[in-house]
Regions:
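Viral virion structural and adsorption modules
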Residues: 216-249
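Loop/turn positions that initiate beta-strands
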Residues: 76, 165-170
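Short beta-strand-centered aromatic/proline hotspots
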Residues: 49-54, 84-94, 168-171, 177-194
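Short alpha-helix capping/helix-loop boundary micro-motifs
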Residues: 61-75, 148-163
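Short, solvent-exposed secondary-structure boundary/capping segments
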Residues: 62-66, 93-106, 189-210, 215-217
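N-terminal intrinsically disordered, low-complexity, charge/repeat-rich segments that act as generic
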Residues: 1-115
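Internal mixed-charge
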Residues: 163-166, 179-182, 190-192, 197-201, ...
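Surface-exposed beta-loop interaction hotspot
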Residues: 84-159
Length: 249
């Protein structure tokens, strides 16, 4: 390598253009600066440890999460941080320097039986849904339901939740409640928070009557439609079988 080639290599170490040079220097600056910032944390993103910056907002259950330069964050990812689960619900498409997303604190572990007859569970966000229309249909007429029996659910899109549809039932309540409330999905909006097949679904559910097919102990609706309910074992009578004859001496 000649002197001129060595010179060219040195001046192009940060890029061939002025823009590339500016970008490289900014990425180096952030990599050196972020670990010293109080917003710098180590979180578990989709079961993988990742160093990120987490910035507070006016809402305590909403944060901004920023990746290190050269790393990425996916819309719909589940983040474990500060002994809580958080769901990434929005992502800035401009990832030139870093990935910037909004994440919300999860408050419910949804449980259901998937089409392959396997019990699934996934963290989601449950909110009051009285401001939404339920999307119910009755006698081919659109029905607007009033009252306080609606909830909104935000959940990550994946191969299992993509199959959720109108009429799917779930038990959604405090996990320690003995008799959990049942809800049916009435507004399966699947395009409001997904981009390039990544992101979150935003559903509206209406309270319905619980049935004998619901397993309140496990928190799974329609559980006994798929799995047999355990039969109560009959205790033998002290007097013996009803067919047994007594003999008197």
């Amino acid at each position: 390598m000649g002197i001129w080639d060595s010179y060219q290599q040195r001046i192009n170490i940060f890029g061939d253009t002025q823009r590339d040079t500016t970008l490289s220097r900014e990425q180096i600056r952030l990599r050196n600066y972020l670990p010293k910032n109080l917003s710098f944390h180590t979180a578990i993103v989709n079961d993988m440890e990742q160093q990120v910056a987490i910035i507070n907002s006016d809402n305590l259950n909403e944060k901004t999460i920023i990746s290190l330069p050269g790393e990425d964050l996916t819309n719909g990812s589940l983040v474990r941080w500060m002994d809580n689960y958080w769901l990434i619900t929005e992502k800035d498409a401009n990832v030139t320097v870093y990935a910037k997303c909004k994440m919300l604190q999860c408050n419910h572990l949804l449980k259901w039986v998937s089409d392959d007859k396997v019990v699934r569970e996934q963290w989601c966000i449950i909110e009051d849904g009285t401001k939404y229309l339920t999307g119910e249909f009755e006698d081919r007429q659109f029905v607007v339901t009033r009252g306080d029996s609606r909830i909104a659910m935000t959940i990550a899109r994946n191969e299992y939740t993509v199959n959720f549809n109108r009429g799917n039932r779930f038990l959604i309540d405090d996990p320690d409640s003995k008799h959990k409330l049942a809800y049916a999905l009435t507004k399966p909006l699947k395009l409001g928070g997904t981009y390039n097949n990544q992101g979150v679904f935003k559903f509206v559910l209406q309270e319905v009557t619980a049935t004998d097919d619901d397993n309140h102990e496990l928190g799974i609706a329609d559980y006994y439609k798929i799995f047999e309910e355990p039969q109560e074992q009959q205790q033998p009578s002290d007097s013996g079988s009803s067919n047994e004859k007594k003999r008197w001496l």
